[in-house]
């Protein structure tokens, strides 16, 4: 008998890591109000997702293991890029209540909806040469960049709407390769570094 535990595979280590980093980001933001740590963890999760496909392809896998890996990646992305930013950003300081809170949660829903819509799109459409709309790891790095400053809870809906639109917009972005890919990775590493320095000093 095949059980879910049999589908645990080392090729998915970076995907599991992204999930763990996202949970840690929630814990640091909600329990400790530490947004430098949350920003570092979000950037690290984005980097883990960026490299998880390359990492997985280094292993010899059966067709089932490849299919499980693809499903796992999509499910984890929904948590890491759809749910985690909402929970982290809701922990930001700011007076709640009234119409503003309704607007906040409506925009959060729109953002989460755009996230899962994008994931569903890429579960069906496979394109190794380009992205349609802004990829979610880049959105996570935008959130991490925002957390470099004392962001107010009240301006988050504007960023939610902008990021949601960017994820599902019908414009084409070539998949970064070479120098472009290195620049993207450097953005993520730089964010982790800056946030960690803020934590120390």
Labelled PLM ranges:
Residues 39-50, 98-112, 151-161:
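Structural signature of hydrophobic alpha-helical transmembrane segments
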Residues 2-3, 54-66, 114-128, 165-175:
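C-terminal ends of transmembrane helices
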Residues 22-29, 85-91, 115-121, 143-147, ...:
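Structural signal for membrane-spanning alpha-helices in multi-pass inner-membrane proteins
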Residues 17-24, 77-88, 111, 134-144, ...:
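Core segments of transmembrane alpha-helices
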Residues 11-16, 58-117:
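Multi-pass membrane catalytic core of lipid/isoprenoid biosynthesis enzymes
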Residues 127-201:
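C-terminal membrane-associated helical module and adjoining short loops/tails
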Residues 3-13, 69-72, 124-132, 154, ...:
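Short, amphipathic, aromatic/basic-enriched membrane-interface segments that mark the entry/exit
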Residues 1-53, 169-171, 175-190, 194-201:
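Topogenic membrane-insertion module of multi-pass membrane proteins
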């Amino acid at each position: 008998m095949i059980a879910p535990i049999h589908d645990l595979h080392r090729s998915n280590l970076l995907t599991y890591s992204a999930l763990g980093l996202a949970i840690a980001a929630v814990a640091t933001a909600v329990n400790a109000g530490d947004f430098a740590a949350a920003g570092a963890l979000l950037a690290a999760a984005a980097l883990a997702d960026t490299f998880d496909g390359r990492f997985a392809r280094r292993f010899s896998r059966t067709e089932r293991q490849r299919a499980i890996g693809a499903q796992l990646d999509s499910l984890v992305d929904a948590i890491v890029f759809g749910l985690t930013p909402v929970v982290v950003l809701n922990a930001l300081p700011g007076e709640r209540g009234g119409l503003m809170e309704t607007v906040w949660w409506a925009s959060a829903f729109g953002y989460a909806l755009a996230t899962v819509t994008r994931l569903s799109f890429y579960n069906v459409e496979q394109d190794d040469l380009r992205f349609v709309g802004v990829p979610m790891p880049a959105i996570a790095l935008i959130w991490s960049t925002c957390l470099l400053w004392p962001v107010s809870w009240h301006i988050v809906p504007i960023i939610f709407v902008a990021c949601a639109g960017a994820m599902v917009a019908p414009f084409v972005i070539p998949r970064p390769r070479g120098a472009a890919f290195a620049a993207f990775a450097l953005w993520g590493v730089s964010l982790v570094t800056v946030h960690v320095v803020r934590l120390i000093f």
